[in-house]
Regions:
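N-terminal glycine/threonine-rich, aromatic-flanked beta-hairpin/loop signature
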Residues: 23-66, 93
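Tryptophan-anchored aromatic micro-motifs
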Residues: 6-32, 97
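N-terminal prepro-regions of secreted/extracellular proteins
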Residues: 1-5
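Short, exposed beta-strand-loop hairpins at the edges of beta-sheets
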Residues: 78-96
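Extracytosolic low-complexity repeat regions of secreted or lipid-anchored proteins
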Residues: 66-82
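Residue-level signal for WD-repeat beta-propeller blades
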Residues: 18, 35-36, 83, 91
Length: 100
């Protein structure tokens, strides 16, 4: 679990106001996502089990067959965050994790 000083101040309120913001926990990382409605983008803070922390920004890309895609906002790197529905994020191993 992550400490309160890592979680965005409005994460609990955001969970009720949009389909993406919140904390998603897997066996290897905790992801804190903050959705920006005005830019249709997501800021990700990933805290891995080994203590490494990475931050990335993603922009809305597409919705296809019920899956919503946000692509990494970078010219150098490629990556996506995918959602199966509100609060249901796909993980790198293909499983779905539920927003906490």
């Amino acid at each position: 679990m992550i400490s309160a000083d890592i979680m965005p101040m409005d994460a609990s309120k955001s969970n009720q106001n949009d389909d993406y913001s919140g904390t998603y926990v897997t066996s290897y990382a905790t992801y804190v996502l903050t959705y920006n409605k005005s830019t249709n983008s997501i800021h990700e803070k990933a805290i891995y089990s080994d203590g490494e922390v990475f931050e990335h920004d993603y922009i809305y890309s597409d919705s296809y067959n019920g899956i919503t895609y946000f692509d990494l906002d970078s010219n150098e790197d490629k990556g996506s965050i995918m959602f199966a529905g509100p609060g249901l994020m796909y993980t790198y191993d293909g499983s779905v994790t539920i927003r906490q």
